[in-house]
């Protein structure tokens, strides 16, 4: 049997001591395995069920723990307790990820990066579920399943499909801003430590007086922005597909703690009402010249997970997890995510995923009437009442936590989104005014490399969108793809419906 080499005795999952973990119970030295070898059966059965469903998006990720510290007074904007005083620290857990790839995909893939922060506050958990880009591809959640399908694998070939990818985007002009960011070098960050994080959505802050404000979050990396070129990303993807995961873990392990400065953009309801575009449209940014940022805090990651599955894989973030002082806006995509994230966690982790330690509130006891369900691993409410109202001392609502009201109006209907905000202006401004010559050269090269694999009719349709954003932008892509620039310009002058008909198969 060999000598015992540990003070700990190996047991089954139920705490029963194990005498031998190397040899199955058999009939004789070379005989068949006996069905009564319950240790073997238990070990194999647990192994058979080790894998849980991977996330439908953001499957590949890394995470770490740390803290958030307030550095500015924001009490006139929000009554959130974790933001109530300068110097206050709140424990956090952060998960970074790619979006479209599977769990084993490369960290260097051209893809937005998830940037999700869980704040363990005294009023429960607050989840800020953002990306490393300030905008997104679509503004209506009804389009989200279709969009994600195009970013994954062809249902027939099971391969990534440039036709699917670009067909959807070229038929969805609102995506042009995010596409321009994605195919810049910011679409391939060097590491998770060298990228920013954004709420992307507009959220609502409200104070003790019941006044509310619209806000956006910007986590600016203190390590500096560093990106990979197309060639660098492809090389690293082949030689070290887990490079960003490893980089984060090793930096924290040696005490080189990454940090981000939280900057906020804040707008009054009156400013929003009169602004030149819909400030809740996730395909747009708020110009910093109109709404400068305000530094309010510091995010620091100083603790590696002790077990990846327990903390990172089982971590579940939801934009529905809001604490008093913070609310959602009428952003359509945000309202869709408020449902969808919680729903997918139930599928992946079960209805009691909030009891998993990484997801459980640490500084605010859970006092709800939720009971039973798979993996209810706490006292399940004990002998207390499981309904409200009751007269047996159960927890009761408190109106002090109600959000202040705000007005909404309109006829209920499925209507085309309309607003005087051209979908191409900000993409053009980004190309002309923000990017350098080097940035523009890489952007065009990255697009041509990927779009060239799609059908020519799709190339023409998508290049027309680049042309609408900026003439030079579209012309350079057309040249790289060897397209007729006159045909591109003709398509650019059409409506979206006309352009779709003109480029049908």
From Swiss-Prot:
Reactions catalysed according to its record: 2 H2O2 = O2 + 2 H2O
Task: Write down the superkingdom of origin.
Answer: Archaea
Q: Name one GO molecular function term.
A: catalase activity
> What are the binding positions for heme in this chain?
341
Q: What class of enzyme is it?
A: oxidoreductase
Q: Does the keyword Ligase apply?
A: no
Gene Ontology CC terms, in alphabetical order:
cytoplasm
Q: Which residues form the signal peptide?
A: none
Q: List the disulfide bonds.
A: none
User: What InterPro entries has UniProt attached to this entry?
Assistant: Catalase, Catalase_3, Catalase_AS, Catalase_clade1/3, Catalase_core, Catalase_haem_BS, Catalase_immune_responsive, Catalase_sf
Q: What does this protein do?
A: Decomposes hydrogen peroxide into water and oxygen; serves to protect cells from the toxic effects of hydrogen peroxide.
Task: State the family named in the UniProt similarity comment for this chain.
Answer: Belongs to the catalase family.
Protein name, as recorded:
Catalase
Q: Which organism is it from?
A: Methanosarcina barkeri (strain Fusaro / DSM 804)
The UniProt gene name for this protein comes to kat
């Amino acid at each position: 049997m060999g000598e015992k080499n540990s003070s700990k005795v190996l047991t089954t999952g139920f705490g029963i001591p194990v005498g031998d973990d190397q040899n199955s119970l058999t009939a004789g030295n070379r005989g068949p395995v006996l069905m009564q070898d319950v240790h073997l059966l238990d070990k194999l059965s647990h192994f058979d069920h080790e894998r849980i469903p991977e996330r439908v998006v953001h499957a590949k990720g890394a995470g770490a723990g740390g803290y958030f510290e307030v550095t500015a007074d924001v009490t006139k904007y929000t009554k959130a307790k974790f933001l109530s005083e300068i110097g206050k620290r709140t424990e956090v857990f952060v998960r970074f990820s790619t979006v479209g790839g599977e769990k084993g995909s490369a960290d260097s893939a051209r893809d937005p990066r998830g940037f999700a922060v869980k704040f363990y506050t005294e009023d429960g958990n607050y989840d800020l579920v953002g990306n490393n880009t300030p905008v997104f591809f679509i503004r209506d959640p009804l389009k989200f399943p279709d969009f994600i399908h195009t970013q994954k694998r062809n249902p027939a070939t099971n391969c990534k499909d440039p036709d699917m990818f670009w067909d959807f985007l070229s038929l969805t002009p609102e995506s042009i801003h995010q596409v321009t960011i994605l195919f810049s070098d910011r679409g391939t960050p060097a590491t998770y430590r060298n990228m920013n994080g954004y709420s992307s959505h507009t959220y609502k802050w409200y104070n003790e007086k019941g006044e509310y404000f619209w806000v956006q979050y910007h986590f600016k990396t203190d390590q500096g922005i560093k990106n990979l070129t197309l060639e660098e990303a492809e090389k690293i993807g082949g030689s070290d597909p887990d490079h960003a995961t490893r980089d984060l873990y090793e930096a924290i392990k040696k005490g080189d703690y990454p940090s981000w400065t939280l900057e906020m953009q804040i707008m009054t309801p009156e400013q929003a009402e009169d602004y030149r575009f819909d400030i809740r449209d996730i395909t747009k940014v708020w110009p910093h010249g109109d709404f400068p940022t305000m530094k309010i805090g510091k995010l620091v990651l100083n603790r590696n997970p002790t077990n990846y599955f327990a903390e990172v894989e089982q971590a579940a973030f939801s934009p529905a997890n809001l604490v008093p002082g913070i609310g959602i806006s009428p952003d359509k995509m945000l309202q869709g995510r408020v449902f969808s994230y919680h729903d997918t966690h139930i599928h992946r982790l079960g209805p009691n995923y909030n009891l998993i330690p990484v997801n459980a509130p640490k500084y605010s006891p859970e006092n709800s009437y939720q009971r039973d369900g798979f993996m209810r691993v706490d006292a399940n409410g004990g002998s207390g009442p499981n309904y409200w109202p009751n007269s047996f001392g159960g927890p009761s609502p408190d109106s002090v936590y109600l959000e202040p009201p705000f007005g909404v109006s309109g006829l209920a209907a499925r209507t085309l989104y309309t607003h005087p905000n051209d979908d191409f202006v900000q993409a053009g401004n980004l190309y002309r005014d923000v990017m350098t010559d080097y940035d523009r050269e890489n952007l065009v090269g990255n697009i041509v490399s990927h779009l060239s694999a799609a059908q020519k009719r799709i190339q023409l349709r998508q290049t027309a969108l680049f042309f609408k954003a900026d003439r030079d932008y579209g012309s350079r892509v057309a040249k790289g793809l060897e397209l007729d620039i006159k045909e591109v310009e003709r398509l650019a002058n059409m409506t979206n419906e006309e352009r779709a008909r003109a480029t049908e198969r």
